[in-house]
UniProtKB/Swiss-Prot annotation:
The lineage of its organism: Bacteria, Pseudomonadati, Pseudomonadota, Betaproteobacteria, Burkholderiales. This is Acetylglutamate kinase. Substrate binds at residues 72-73, 94, 196. One of its GO terms (cellular component) is cytoplasm. It catalyses: N-acetyl-L-glutamate + ATP = N-acetyl-L-glutamyl 5-phosphate + ADP. Catalyzes the ATP-dependent phosphorylation of N-acetyl-L-glutamate. InterPro entries: AceGlu_kinase-like_sf (IPR036393), AcgluKinase_fam (IPR004662), ArgB (IPR037528), Asp/Glu/Uridylate_kinase (IPR001048), NAGK-C (IPR041727). Pathway: Amino-acid biosynthesis; L-arginine biosynthesis; N(2)-acetyl-L-ornithine from L-glutamate: step 2/4. The gene is argB. It is found in: Cytoplasm.
């Protein structure tokens, strides 16, 4: 892993050069929306959490509109463990029975979201927390998980949903009033049930609906890796399909890369998978020329 960037050790002239390098990117993204899927170590290590909060505040201050969609898998696992319940995953998706759904809502919409909002506000930003149930933001339907061993059959994984529709009005209203939206990936269905939705899928759909200029997905690895552990810096749709087919992309990376590719195909101009373990990874990707992570292309 790259060493964290310690800005206190950078000479003033170099700091000026860094700011000058950022200027064309600030101009490019000024007034534009950037959707950030926030997760992994960046959500659990205090140094990285504080760095992320400062990053999104800086983006807002220079006229870029960050929208945060957060995960919370480790926190959900810890909460389930406390009640003696093990987490189960199928194809990267958490099996969510009624009891697990109650835990998911409490952890994501309460503990995790409020931690993010509080930290951003502590450092001088203005963040507002939402779940997909607020303002009719995320309409969900039950996810039918295809059974790979039995074509035409589906696996019931409980109250796991997929995005049926997004009403972005509440997000746009917050942006217009200079707030930073922080969204928990919980949707509501026509059946009256709450649904646990993979945060990567929500981030991709939201980026599309908001006509975002950029979608960033933070993870705990440098980006998409080949079978020899080498970083793949640029992937086309055809190359991604091949990596799905040979099993290079698997587990929790499946929904992440699928969502990233769908967003790219739907018109999001820039889609990147970035290493959230590196301090200030958001700023490095958006405001510098530094090649960073994996770029996902639709063609």
């Amino acid at each position: 892993m790259s060493e964290p960037i310690d800005l206190s050790q950078i000479a003033p002239t170099l700091k000026a050069e860094i700011l000058a390098e950022a200027l064309p990117y600030i101009r490019r993204y000024h007034g534009k929306t950037v959707v950030i899927k926030y997760g992994g170590n960046a959500m659990t290590e205090e140094r990285l959490k504080q760095g992320f909060a400062r990053d999104v505040i800086l983006l807002k201050l220079v006229g870029i509109n960050p929208v945060i969609v957060h995960g919370g898998g480790p926190q959900i696992d810890q909460a389930l463990k406390k009640i003696g319940k093990a987490g189960t995953f199928i194809q990267g998706m958490r099996v969510t029975d009624e009891e697990t759904m109650e835990v998911v809502e409490w952890v994501l919409g309460g503990e995790v979201q409020q931690d993010i909002v509080t930290l951003i506000n502590h450092f001088g930003g203005h963040a507002v927390g939402l779940t997909g149930k607020d303002g009719g933001l995320i309409h969900a339907r039950k996810l039918l998980m295809p059974d790979r061993d039995n074509p035409g059959q589906y696996i019931d994984i409980g109250q796991v949903g997929e995005v049926e529709a997004i009403n972005p009005a509440v997000v746009k209203a917050l942006q217009d009033d200079a707030f930073i939206p922080v969204i928990s990936p919980i949707g509501f269905g026509e059946d009256g049930l709450s649904y646990n939705i993979n945060a990567d899928l929500v981030a991709g759909k939201l980026a599309t609906v908001l006509n975002a200029e950029k979608l960033l997905m933070m993870t705990n690895i440098p980006g998409v890796m080949d079978k020899d552990g080498n970083l793949l810096t640029d992937l086309s749709a055809r190359e991604i399909d091949a990596l799905f087919e040979d099993g290079t992309i698997s587990g929790g990376m499946l929904p992440k890369i699928s969502s990233a590719l769908d967003a790219a195909k739907s018109g999001v101009k820039s889609v990147h998978i970035v290493d959230g373990r590196i301090e200030h990874s958001v700023l490095l990707e958006i405001l510098t020329e530094q090649p960073f992570g994996t770029m996902i292309r639709s063609h």
